[in-house]
Amino acid sequence: PRSTLFPYTTLFRSLQNDRTESKYFQSLNGDWKFHFSPNPNDRSENFHKANYDDSDWSEIIVPGHWELQGWSVPIYLDEEYPFPPNPPFVPHDYNAVGSYRKSFTIPDSWDGRHIFLHFGGVRSAFYVWINGDFVGYSQGSKTPAEFDITDFVQIGENNVSVAVYRFSDGSYLEGQDTWRVSGIEREVFIYARSKTRISDFFAITSLDSTFKNGIISLKIDVENKGEPNQPYAIRVKLTDSSRRKRELYDSTFVTTIDSSNSIRFDSEITRVKSWTAEEPNLYTLRLSISDSTGRLIEAISQKVGFKKVEVKNGNLLVNGKAIMIRGVNRHEWDPVRGRAITEESMVRDIQLMKQNNINAVRTSHYPNQERWYELCNEYGLYVIDEANIEAHGMQFHDESFGH
């Protein structure tokens, strides 16, 4: 696991933070070739081969669910599983499998870079092949999975094949009170990164005792798959949201990077505007890495807010003031698209909440799409985030997961 980030090769692009404008990003959303099998025995064993003939296959929209596009039916359950519980086993005779195939092209400009395949969420388990070669497996429907496909792709045309299983042993931990639907339900894309890069970062923001000055603690992980022991400059910059982009902090740290390094920054920022649900003031944190000649390798940016949350004398305080939580539970659900929701749908939900004086939302009962958290940050909503763990169907006897 790592933080949500996307690298850019210019400072301007990093401030825009629109990855669709990057030449090193390619969406794989849209039409995929698709074959439905009611159980694993009925699926084609060789569908992942590069030269497999899928001309007679149907098409399916990704992201999406096969139950909402003409194959099988959705199942709604709360405190039961859609199969007799016998962990870790799942039924074999009616465990549907969706086989997906899609072609994509790697441009010449990606040569020499590391290439990654990103799945935002797949329910419930899946295998991945590139050009007929097995790349990996993942399960856990509500968190992203990434695969380094550098050694599997070629410049020019390539093929990705995916086998998605409706049930897996992970289904025992995904017993949420909601519709049970299957498939690639979040975005899919590929992207290319420099051999030397910012691999992760973790920013903690707060306020001092006066609630006027900001405190930021930052840990940056850098990775070097290129030339070792070369000096690199890591720059941290914080600007406000005004038209002039006033600088509040600017610092550079020069270090050599063997295979991986971690760098820490701690600073106090004077006279910041604090973040609350009523006034969601945000700042732009920009991280960049450059080589010894000053050439920018990549830059990333992230919106951050300064707030201090405490519990004192039974009161929940935000920036020293007691607040009243007026919250709602929210499932990721669209009446047409199911859990394959769009940004427009998210914004519409948030606007309805704000219009009705709602200031908090619970992600019942799993992590949401990354964009949801960014929008809550921008519009001003307190978020109660939940892990993708719920096992209602096993809770009333000695073999329950609670034991």
Provide a role label for each language-model segment.
Residues T4-L11:
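Short, small-residue-biased leader/transition segments that mark boundaries at the very start
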Residues D18-R19, K33-S37, H65-L68, V73, ...:
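Accessory beta-strand-rich segments of carbohydrate-active enzymes
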Residues W110-H114, V153-E157, N229, I269-T284:
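Short glycine/proline/serine/threonine-rich loop/turn segments at secondary-structure transition edges
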Residues S124-Y127, K142-T150, A163, D169-L173, ...:
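Active-site mouth of glycoside hydrolases
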Residues R166-Y172, S290-I297:
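Short acidic/polar inter-strand loop motif in beta-rich domains
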